[in-house]
């Protein structure tokens, strides 16, 4: 039987040393599932609420005992004894139990931990890998990684205004080959930065955080490292950006503190379009601020047919905001972060809506991560073809890459690599 017999919540630490939630779900047949919840540094205003204790005597107010108490008490009381395979029904109960639009009463961190641990427990009971349990027989596409090798913005203590500069091994034949490519470029970039006198400290997501003056300077270093490592920019390896523009959008303008420049909405869109023409940039995430719909429309009209434009803060994995954006013709892709919405069922619904509208989907980590590798399985389960899970250092990031290597090995000849076709802009 897959009846839920126990749910145990606990407070653990994430990759930034902040508390987060971990949940164990035990079933009657002895099966068990465990999930840990990530957290973000640059968070969208419309995300589901991560419940913190606000007790300044513990972890500077960042403790999650309230969320843990909700898991061990109210949530277990509501779903204990239910069949773990009834994922959608249980997720609906959890949403109703919270009773708020943004999961602020029980906390999205509490609800998500239970939702994901539940899926893992059910998969364990059926002796199935998570990607197969969630995705069925068609789950076999290994994603192209977006490897964040230079960090800026709120992810690093340097002057670079953009948050992430990523490489995508679109020309690789397999995931493992793509991972090797990324690793070789990462180590080459380290050597090149060091040779030029820059520090090689890493940011929250494992990328380097050098004191470079502009986005172009960072892109030039990355282009050089790609060539030096023996790869061809644009053919073997494409570039992707995450400006996280909401972080520097002030009073209707984009304020580049590091560069000492201010750009209007139109200037911001045209600046990004120029970068995309000057470099082999195939994906830009959050190039405009989350509520700058005018800017998003302008950017989409400018380069939406040739570049993947990913909405993260714009959509926050929320079907209501996604439907609104689709209707307005904003972006052409959605970033999928499970903790932005708070249940597995709602996450899968967002992916499905994106696909139906002809949008791509990118499975994503958060800057505050754990060793939990659920998103690797979800990337394969949804066949989304793209994953964003950090750089080639820090074990919290490598955990996801290593899980994808295992999945590729398990799938054997069935495995397919997303490659160039994963991005509609390149297909």
Curated annotation (Swiss-Prot):
Top-level taxonomic group: Bacteria
Predominant place of localization: cytoplasm
GO MF annotation, one: phosphopyruvate hydratase activity
Active site, UniProt feature: 205, 337
One GO cellular component term noted in the UniProt record for this chain: phosphopyruvate hydratase complex
Binding-site positions, (2R)-2-phosphoglycerate: 163, 337, 366-367, 388
SUPFAM superfamilies, A to Z: Enolase C-terminal domain-like (SSF51604), Enolase N-terminal domain-like (SSF54826)
Keywords on record: Cytoplasm, Glycolysis, Lyase, Magnesium, Metal-binding, Secreted
Protein name: Enolase
Species of the source: Nitrobacter hamburgensis (strain DSM 10229 / NCIMB 13809 / X14)
Gene (UniProt): eno
